[in-house]
Amino acid sequence: MTEDKTIQQVCVLVLDYGSPRSLEDVKEYYTRIRRGHMPSDEELQGLRHKYERIGGQSQLMETTVWQVKQLQEELQNELSFAKVTVVQAHKYIEPLIGDVAKELDHYDTVVVLMMNPYGTDLLNASYLEPLQPFMNDRWKVVQNWAGAPTLVSSWVGRVKDTLCTLPSGATPHYVCTAHSVPLMKGISYDGYVHSLERVMEGIASRLELPNVTLAWQSAGTRGEWLTPTVEAVTEQVGADGYTHVVYIPIGFTCTHMEVSYDLDIERRDQCEQLGMNYVRVPMPDYDTLFVKAMAYGVLDTLLKEG
């Protein structure tokens, strides 16, 4: 059978941070994060300890494989004129972004989708840098897909389910969290912050949630980062007399280190010390509404730009 030349060959290249698949991968992973500079023994042991506490690896790699597979099915159902292939590449673990990109020249169109819905030109730049030698007018980039209606719906459903587990008489404060970014002179993160605020406000409005705060987590140890920190917000919530803190990690797309350790271990410990109950809303992980939000970003970019 000859190939139908009227069918466009569309590739969606999904980019994410990546995560070590085992403790043996931690050193190489950490070295790449540090732009080729080897971590000290103390730094390496600290990161290994975190992975050991969450079972030796995060769920990111397994979960994103499922998300990518579901995204391909969703897009193929929507794009009758195309044969859709969705491939995945990582920033700090194999398969690396540049290695995957060099194999995509035979596609009619390549659409690049960052797993972070709240992208800006600045935040996306480090993901796109390895692609520059391969990009041409057949490549399109989804810069931000936080406006996808089902992104808010995905969170609303899981927050609603979580609220049903709270005991009668609980007084919860809701803390939406996202990854902090370093503050640098002349650089604005307003687009990132505003995208997160809109999603937070959408969730709060749909569920009529009072007492909702956006807090920044997982900051580095050097320089100044966005505030308020999740540590400071948790401290204040305790001082205000709330019995429960409900964390909604809207800045993340699946269960990984920043959720399993930075929230489930560190914030849980802090809540217990303050006499509060720790509650976390489940991550998008295997939520089909979240996959539809990813597809929205791809379709909006692909069809809008022709």
Predicted segments with their positions:
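Active-site-proximal alpha-helix that buttresses catalytic centers in soluble enzyme cores
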Residues: T2-G306
